[in-house]
C-alpha cells in the first residue's frame, strides 16, 4: 500500500473551532507513525494536480475563479462553512494530486492500494461551486480523468459519510461510465441531489443512529448489485468517517 500526503495540506487554515481543521490531519499522521504503519508504508509526498485534469472535471472557469478568491492574507469566506487562506488552493491542488497520482500508481502496477491522507476534503464541491469545506472534488477529478487511460472503461466511486456526496454526484451524474454510490444520514446537510436515481447513481439515505448491521445490510442491498452490474476497472473510496 502507498500513503500520500503533503505538508501544505496542514497549511489550509480555517477559523478557530471549525470542525475541518489542520489538527485532524496532524493527529492522523501522528497516529500512523506511532503505530508503526509508516515503518511498513513510508509517507509519499503528493504532487499537485494539473490544471488540465481539474478543468476536465470542473471546467476552466471554476479553477480560475478559486484563484481569484484566494486571499493574500487572513481568511476569506466562500460560504458560511467554506473558507480559504493564502495556501488553501495549494493544499487542495495537492489533495487532488494525491488521488490522481494514486490512480496512476494503481493502474500502472506500482501498487494495488493507495491511501490519501489529505485535506481539504472534496465531495461537496460541485461543478462550479465550492461548499461544505470543499474546494476541488478530488475523487471526481480522478475518476473523470481515469477514463482517458487505456483499459479504464468503467470507474466506481464508493462514498460513505454522514453527509451526502452531492458534489461527486453533480460532477458524475451525466457520465454513465462512473458509478457513484453514496450513503448518508437523511435528512441532513447538504440536502441537494440526494433524490437522483439512475443506474449509475445510487443514493442510500439512512436515518440518524443507524447501527452497523443495518448499514451493512443497506450497502449489500443497494450497492453490491450496482457494482456487479457496472463491472468497474477501478474503485475509488471516498471516505468521510464522520
Question: Which role fits each region the language model picked out?
Answer:
Residues 1-242:
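HDAC/HDAC-like amidohydrolase catalytic core signature
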Amino acid at each position: 500500500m502507498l500513503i500520500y500526503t503533503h505538508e501544505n495540506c496542514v497549511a489550509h487554515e480555517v477559523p478557530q473551532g471549525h470542525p475541518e481543521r489542520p489538527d485532524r490531519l496532524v493527529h492522523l499522521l501522528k497516529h500512523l507513525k506511532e503505530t508503526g504503519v509508516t515503518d511498513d508504508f513510508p509517507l509519499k509526498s503528493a504532487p499537485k494536480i494539473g490544471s488540465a485534469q481539474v478543468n476536465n472535471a470542473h471546467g476552466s472557469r471554476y479553477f480560475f475563479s478559486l484563484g481569484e478568491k484566494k486571499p493574500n492574507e487572513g481568511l476569506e469566506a466562500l460560504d458560511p462553512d467554506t473558507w480559504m487562506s493564502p495556501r488553501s488552493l495549494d493544499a487542495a491542488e495537492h489533495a487532488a494530486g494525491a488521488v490522481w497520482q494514486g490512480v496512476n500508481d494503481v493502474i500502472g502496477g506500482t501498487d494495488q492500494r493507495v491511501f490519501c491522507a489529505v485535506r481539504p476534503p472534496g465531495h461537496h464541491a460541485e461543478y462550479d461551486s465550492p461548499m461544505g469545506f470543499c474546494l476541488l472534488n478530488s475523487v471526481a477529478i480522478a475518476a473523470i480523468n481515469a477514463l482517458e487511460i487505456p483499459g479504464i472503461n468503467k470507474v466506481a466511486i464508493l462514498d460513505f459519510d454522514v453527509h451526502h456526496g452531492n458534489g461527486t454526484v453533480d460532477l458524475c451524474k451525466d457520465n454513465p461510465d462512473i458509478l457513484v454510490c453514496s450513503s448518508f444520514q437523511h435528512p441532513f446537510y447538504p440536502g441537494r441531489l440526494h433524490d437522483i436515481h439512475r443506474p449509475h447513481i445510487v443514493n442510500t439515505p439512512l436515518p440518524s443512529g443507524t447501527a452497523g448491521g443495518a448499514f451493512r445490510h443497506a450497502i449489500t442491498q443497494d450497492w453490491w448489485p450496482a457494482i456487479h452490474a457496472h463491472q468497474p476497472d477501478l474503485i475509488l473510496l471516498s471516505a468521510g468517517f464522520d
